[in-house]
């Protein structure tokens, strides 16, 4: 793709190794851990910055991940702050972070999939209970060529 040719990037990246999108082991979803995932993203993210027009927006959809205690060895569910890791990752590659939109999700549906917030667990020990995880749209900009006004090189103007 040509440099500085894309007006908007809006994508939902894989959430580390949370989902497998295909059986292909070269797929972004096939990673041993979050560190390996971001090693793969280190190849993609500079390309996103390169093709985005100066001053334009990249909107990245992410979600924090529930880590189950039987997998982590803690014995209790914890939350991996994946959205915070993504903010650091994109900033490391030159994107300017300027906001986050919270996407409220259906906690009942999430509970039905994981059984971690159920009444039976509450009755055993309420201190174990967590909360449902919302999703986020992280907002980044590529710096414009002229930084004195913060306007994009090709402005998005209302007519």
Feature-to-residue mapping (PLM):
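Core catalytic lobe of class I
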Residues: 1-159
């Amino acid at each position: 793709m040509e440099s500085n040719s894309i007006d908007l990037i809006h994508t939902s990246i894989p959430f580390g190794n949370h989902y497998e999108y295909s059986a292909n082991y070269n797929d972004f979803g096939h990673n041993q851990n979050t560190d390996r995932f971001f090693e793969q993203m280190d190849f993609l993210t500079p390309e996103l910055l390169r093709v985005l027009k100066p001053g334009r927006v990249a909107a990245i959809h992410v979600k924090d991940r529930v880590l189950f205690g039987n997998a982590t060895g803690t014995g209790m569910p914890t939350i991996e702050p994946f959205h915070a890791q993504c903010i650091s990752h994109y900033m490391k590659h030159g994107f300017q972070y300027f906001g986050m939109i919270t996407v409220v999700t259906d906690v009942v549906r999430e509970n039905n999939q994981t059984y971690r917030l159920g009444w039976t667990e509450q009755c055993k020990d309420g201190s174990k209970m967590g909360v449902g995880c919302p999703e986020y749209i992280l907002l980044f900009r590529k710096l414009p060529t002229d930084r004195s006004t913060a306007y994009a090189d090709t402005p998005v103007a209302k007519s």
